[in-house]
Design a protein with these regions (language model features):
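Canonical Rossmann dinucleotide-binding motif of NAD(H)/NADP(H)-dependent dehydrogenases/reductases
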Residues: 3-37
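Conserved Rossmann-fold SDR core element
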Residues: 87, 178-195, 237-244
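Conserved NAD(P)H cofactor-binding loop of Rossmann-fold oxidoreductase domains
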Residues: 94-100, 247
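Substrate-binding pocket helix/loop in short-chain dehydrogenase/reductase
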Residues: 102-103, 110-112, 209
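A short, exposed helix-loop element centered on a Lys and neighboring polar residues
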Residues: 126-127, 172
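C-terminal substrate-recognition "lid" of short-chain dehydrogenase/reductases
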Residues: 181, 220-244, 249
């Protein structure tokens, strides 16, 4: 791990408490020397363990709880970041919810819950962080995590995929809005495939996942981390949604 200095860049990663893709992104950025703000909603113990792991490896990290669908809590989160770190260079919106449910059983409450976390929270964080970044000479980079399946939906995920389908439009809109305030603020998105296989997946299922891609490889979490770094580092990429599915979309259903 690169030893961070008090002037090193700062990254906020939402939904990074538990061992999901946000957590892996936060750890990867910490390894690159970023000072990390771990966001969680309920996973307090997991978030504190992540902070402890990063700090024991020589990094700098803090954990912050927030319900990101509540505007006041979003404001409070970024006020804490501004107070504790004095800057914000990267925001990765990785917080999300999903739960398979047949169309017959999906309720209005289910749809609302998906939009509340997957759409509204992403919007509120983009706006708050983006306006904060626009006041910095260095600008900043916002990366939204969408889903490659939004154009090739799976059954039983209608509420989830509908909410995730807003991410490309949200990303492009925020890119235009924020660039008009500071051209060094960029907003991009990653649309990954199933990067974290369920623990119970059999080898046959894993092989099926590999065979369903052009590259004949599983969607691995490190590919998302690499893409996050690319979008941070490449200052000429803005308003782009990177499809990260190994070419699966070209092979049909």
């Amino acid at each position: 791990m690169s030893s961070p200095e008090p002037t090193n860049p700062v990254a906020v990663v939402t939904g990074s408490g538990r061992t999901r893709i946000g957590n892996l992104i936060a750890r990867d950025l910490a390894n690159a020397g970023y000072r990390i703000a771990i966001h969680y909603r309920q996973s307090h113990e997991a978030a504190e363990k992540t902070v402890a792991d990063i700090c024991s490896a020589g990094g700098i990290a803090s954990a912050y709880p927030a319900d990101l669908s509540e505007e006041q809590e979003v404001d409070r989160l970024f006020e804490h970041v501004a107070t504790n770190f004095q800057r914000l260079d990267v925001l990765v919106n990785a917080a999300s919810v999903w739960s398979p449910k047949s169309l017959e059983k999906v309720t209005a409450a289910d749809v609302y819950d998906n939009f509340r976390v997957n759409t509204l929270a992403t919007f509120l964080c983009c706006r708050r962080a983006g306006l904060m970044m626009s006041l910095q000479e260095t600008g900043g980079s916002i990366i939204n995590i969408g889903d490659a399946r939004m154009d090739r939906p799976l059954a039983d995920y209608s509420a989830y995929l509908t909410s995730k389908g807003s991410i490309p439009t949200l990303t492009r809109s925020m890119a235009v809005e924020l660039a008009s305030r500071n051209p060094r603020v960029r907003v991009n998105a990653i649309l990954p495939g199933s990067v974290m296989a369920p623990p119970e997946a059999t080898e046959v299922e894993q092989q099926r996942r590999r065979d369903a891609t052009l590259v004949k490889s599983a969607d691995l979490p490190h590919t998302v981390c690499h893409t996050v770094r690319y979008l941070i580092d490449n200052e000429f990429v803005n308003g782009t949604c990177v499809m990260l599915d190994g070419g699966r979309a070209l092979l049909g259903p």
